[in-house]
Structures are given as C-alpha cells and as structure tokens.
C-alpha cells in the first residue's frame, strides 16, 4: 500500500553559525584569488621598475667611487715607466704592478663602501632611503586607460650589491713607430633588487679611462707602408764613420 505523506514543511533559515562560516570561507577564497591575480599582474611592472632603478643607482655608485679615487689618488704617471737608451730613444715600457694593484684595491674599497651605504640606506645620494614605489591598482587590468585608476599599492625595494674591478692596459700603434697607451679601470657591479617573493639581478659595467699617453719612438730610415706580403727591398745607407772618412778624403784631395 502506498504510504501517506504529510504536508511538506518549509525549512527555516540556516543557523547563524553556518552563515558565518560560509561567509568567512568565501571571503578567504575570494581574497586569495584576488591577491594572486594582483600579484601576477603587478610583478612584471615592479621588476622592470626595480631593474631601471637599480641600474641608475649602480651607475651613480661607479661614478662617485671613481671620482673619490681620482681626487685623492697619486700621480698616474707612476703606473708605467718608459726606459730609453743612451741616445734618448725609447726602448721598453714597464708597468708598475705594485701601483696597478694599489689602484685596483683602492677603487674596489670605494665601490664596496658605496654599495654598503646603498644597502643600509645611510648616505649615498640616490639611495638615502628605501626605494618605495606606488603602483596603481588599475595596473592589474593591463589596460592603458585604466592603468592609473584605483588606490596605489606601496611596494618597498631592497638592494644587495657586489663589485668587481680590473685594471686594463691597451697599446694602440699609430703613425710610424708611435703608440698610444691607454690605462682604464673596468668596473662590474651586480645589484640584486628584492621585493616580496621575487628578486632580479641587474649587471652594470663601465670602462673608465684613468691615463692616456702618446709615446713616440725612433723613426726608422726605411718604412714599408704598403703592408703587403712582397719582398722588402734592402737599402744600405752609409754609416756615420764612412761619411766621415769620405769627407776627410775629399779635404785631403783638395
């Protein structure tokens, strides 16, 4: 026999504790998804801005370090010594390794000092305070029209740097038996910009000339300027002794 069902009873509203629990769960999920979307959209913008700011600060560190060293450094002529023969003709050029290593050490110390100021934010012009960037929330949309809308989110950058230096010498020949000596300091700075849950390293290099000198050697009596692979003709010139003997003969004959 079919069972008789009584009248359908409508259920009442959910208890308050269930409503509160569902609201909290929904709020946590929606907040997590929103933060994940915002972070994914803003992170590339933050890293690009941080890299540009890092390169700017690293360039200032190099310039200030070289300027501080050049203002207090010893005479750059001591970096190389030119040796001549008894006739005053240039024979060899010797580089003073002690002075070269001293230059490298002093510049490295200057760079490390400025990088330390940059990391601790105590005194370097351009890094006197933490780098703070305010990104509009409209950057999340990726739309140029809406990019400047919404509240601005402050993001703080931290910087960590390391420096490498080397003294390079180049000798470039020019003219006839002439040379141009170029002594420069190669500087490489690696600065890592750190934001919450992300980091990126920027490398800045610079080659700073510290001493340039033109050296003129003895002009040869014969010069093959063609540079070809042909046979070089042999030209024999009378020596000074032979010229003196010939002149004496001419005087005696007269």
UniProtKB/Swiss-Prot annotation:
- Superkingdom classification of source: Bacteria
Q: Where is the composition biased (Polar residues)?
A: 231-242
Q: Which residues cross the membrane?
A: 18-38
Please list the residue ranges that the record marks as compositionally biased, kind Basic and acidic residues.
Answer: 243-254
Its induction, per UniProt?
Expression controlled by a sigma-E-regulated promoter which needs the sigma-E factor for the binding of the RNA polymerase and subsequent transcription.
**Subcellular location, record wording:** Cell membrane
What is any one of the record's Gene Ontology cellular component terms?
plasma membrane
Describe its membrane topology: Single-pass membrane protein
GO biological process terms on file: sporulation resulting in formation of a cellular spore
User: Sorted alphabetically, which Pfam families does this protein's record hold?
Assistant: Spore_YunB
Per UniProt, which keywords does this protein have?
Cell membrane, Membrane, Sporulation, Transmembrane, Transmembrane helix
- Record keyword Membrane present: yes
Q: Where is this region: Disordered?
A: 226-254
Q: What is its main location?
A: membrane
Q: Which function does this protein serve?
A: Required for sporulation.
Q: What is this protein called?
A: Sporulation protein YunB
């Amino acid at each position: 026999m079919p069972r008789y069902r009584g009248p359908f009873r409508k259920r009442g509203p959910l208890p308050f504790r269930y409503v509160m629990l569902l609201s909290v769960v929904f709020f946590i999920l929606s907040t997590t998804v929103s933060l994940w979307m915002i972070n994914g959209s803003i992170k590339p913008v933050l890293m690009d801005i941080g890299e540009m700011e890092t390169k700017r600060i690293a360039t200032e560190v190099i310039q200030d370090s070289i300027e501080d060293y050049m203002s207090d450094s010893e005479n750059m002529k001591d970096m190389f010594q030119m040796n001549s023969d008894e006739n005053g003709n240039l024979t060899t050029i010797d580089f003073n390794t002690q002075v070269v290593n001293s230059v490298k050490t002093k510049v490295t110390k200057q760079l490390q000092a400025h990088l330390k100021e940059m990391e601790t934010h105590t005194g370097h012009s351009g890094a006197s305070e933490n780098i703070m960037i305010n990104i509009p929330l409209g950057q999340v949309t990726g739309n140029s029209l809406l990019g400047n809308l919404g509240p601005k989110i402050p993001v703080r950058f931290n910087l960590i740097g390391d420096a490498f230096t080397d003294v390079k010498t180049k000798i470039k020949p020019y003219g006839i038996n002439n040379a141009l000596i170029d002594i420069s300091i190669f500087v490489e700075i690696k600065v890592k910009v750190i934001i919450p849950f992300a980091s990126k390293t920027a490398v800045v290099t610079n080659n700073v000339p510290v001493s340039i000198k033109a050296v003129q050697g003895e002009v040869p009596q014969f010069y093959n300027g063609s540079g070809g692979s042909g046979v070089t003709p042999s030209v024999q010139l009378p020596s000074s002794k032979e010229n003196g003997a010939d002149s004496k003969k001419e005087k005696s004959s007269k």
